[in-house]
Amino acid sequence: IHPSDLDPDLCRQIRASILLAGPMLARSGELILPPPGGDVIGRRRVDTHILALNKLGALFSYNDCFHFSAPQLKGAEILLDEASVTATENTIMAAVKAEGRTIIRNAASEPHIQQLCQFLNLLGADIKNIGSNTLIIDGVKELHGGEFTIGPDYLEVISFVGAAVVTRGEIR
């Protein structure tokens, strides 16, 4: 992935394209991202992402695309203004390669956040307090490869349970 050559049409198809900001800043120090698209459930804020990455030393501008740059990310104390899952993920992925310690307060703590932290630790990251709303991340210079099994999607599981209850059906 080249940080300034992302396909605008693909980025506009998914809201999650904003999740490229943290890892690309950690990897290359730059990202030019066409505006994310995807679902039309409602307005999706990205300012929590921008403010958190800014605390780590990233600069941000907007002119038809989001432009993030950070020659060197540095650890910081960050209070997320909302416990956003994607902003927490973005901040974690940037902070693992930032120089020094990062403390993320009001972090989302959903199971997939915990699994992301466990996976990154397997790759050589140093993330503590996994599962809490305050994460402590000591940045590392390098990550390495590894294998990780992702657990079941708890939202999908509860959807099936709810459907069975409403229809008085069974789950097999």
What do the predicted segments below correspond to?
Residues 1-172:
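Structural preference for solvent-exposed beta-strand-turn elements
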